[in-house]
Amino acid sequence: MGEIGKLTINGKVFEHVKTRAYAPVSIFKSGDLFLRKGPKKLLEEEIAFHRTLLEYDFPIPRILEEGDLEGEYYYIETSLGEKHFGEIFIEDTKNHGGISKNHFGNFLEVAEKFAKAQLATRNERRNEESFYSGLGLEFNIEELPELKEDTLRAFDKVKEKSKSLPYVLTHGDFNPYNILERGVIDFGSSFHAPAGYDIVTNIYHIYNFPEKDGYEMKRCFDFSEQQKETYLEKMNVIYREAGLPEPTDFADDFIFCRTIWATVRNEKIPKIQKWRYDRFGKILAAYLRDESLPELVEKEWGK
């Protein structure tokens, strides 16, 4: 119990940080501890999933405590760092004009641990229903019905091209804003997808934000070409050693899929929504024409 916006448990005061956009779960912080509070069934499922991730050695927080609270359920977990890499990279860019070598190295180290743990979940069963649902393809078709035929044709192309890849447990929103100095947070968007989807889109997701002012959000940092090359080659090595095709061979497919995901359910940010609708149409057409999407997004939406 406690003041509005605060909870006190075992003498520790937790202050409200945020409430998830698409789930009735509130997040509180006390020092280096985080508390999540919400419906019991939802959080018990989340805790069980969290423990599964730990079994696969994903770099994620440890759960210290759980229980009933004010008619709901809660659990407390350790912190993985004070700032996510989105914040760190923005500060680097403001202060030094780009992402620092040391911070990029830390980011890469966590991403490598994640990639290796994720491959331990590989499954030859292709759960295409989970992939379809996880990307929000149904929402995309509802919001952009005039593009339905081309969108479904493009998704069929993705499925065909990625047949050589096993499916893995996928974060769904793997990007610098969900990666901290000691691990990864917020698996709330997880689903099953072809191996490499998270890995490639991690460094291309920033292009789903406009660089200019006048929007609810904007892109405030970018990776250098050398950093992109270093990151992608590290990931390619991990996949080669696992006997799998290189993720970069599927960059077009994964960037297109991440664009589907980023385009939907943006009602609360209408300026970004319109910008992403226009952008999706361009990327969809380019993907169906077999154009290079890494080159396109960097040319059209990069610096």
Q: Which stretches of residues belong to each language-model region?
A:
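An alpha-helical support segment within catalytic cores of ATP-dependent transferases
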Residues: 2, 122-172
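Active-site acidic catalytic loop and adjacent metal/ATP-binding pocket
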Residues: 18, 24-30, 156-197
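ATP-binding glycine-rich loop module of kinase domains
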Residues: 18-47
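Short beta-strand micro-motifs within the conserved protein kinase catalytic domain, predominantly
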Residues: 62-73
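Conserved short submotifs of the Hanks-type protein kinase catalytic core
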Residues: 71-84
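Conserved kinase catalytic-core helix
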Residues: 83-130, 152, 158-162
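Active-site activation/catalytic loop segments of kinase-like enzymes and analogous catalytic loops
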Residues: 199-243, 255-276
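ATP/Mg2+ or Mg2+-diphosphate-binding catalytic cores
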Residues: 257-303
